[in-house]
Amino acid sequence: MRVTRHASAPGYEPPAHHGVAAMRLQGHEAGPTERFWVGLSYYLSGGGAGESPAGEETVYVVLDGTLVVTAAGQEAELGPLDSVHLPKGTVRRVDNQSARPATLLVIIGTRQEPS
């Protein structure tokens, strides 16, 4: 069992993000995982993730606040405990259009080597 305390979770800077503070809870800098990694992102008002393809299968779960996710010509406003699944390669965008911060749990698959 490997525990990552919020206070000691390593931060990272995701590409094409602005007004976002991100940390890894499991995987990568937080310790090895086999099939996925988990992050926590804080989106300030006006913050967002620019349009880019999901590098691997991705799930977002909004923990607090609201975020607007745009993908494949669809737009969805997500509130607390709402989630969205993005298949690998889906071009997506995330925006905090509200006046308050939002917290997002991020689960992303890792590249699997062919067996």
Question: Whereabouts are the PLM-identified features?
Answer:
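Glycine- and acidic-residue-biased ligand/ion/polar-headgroup-sensing regions
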Residues: 55-67, 72
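Ligand-binding loop in jelly-roll beta-barrel domains
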Residues: 88-114
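Short acidic-glycine-tyrosine-enriched beta hairpin
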Residues: 73-88
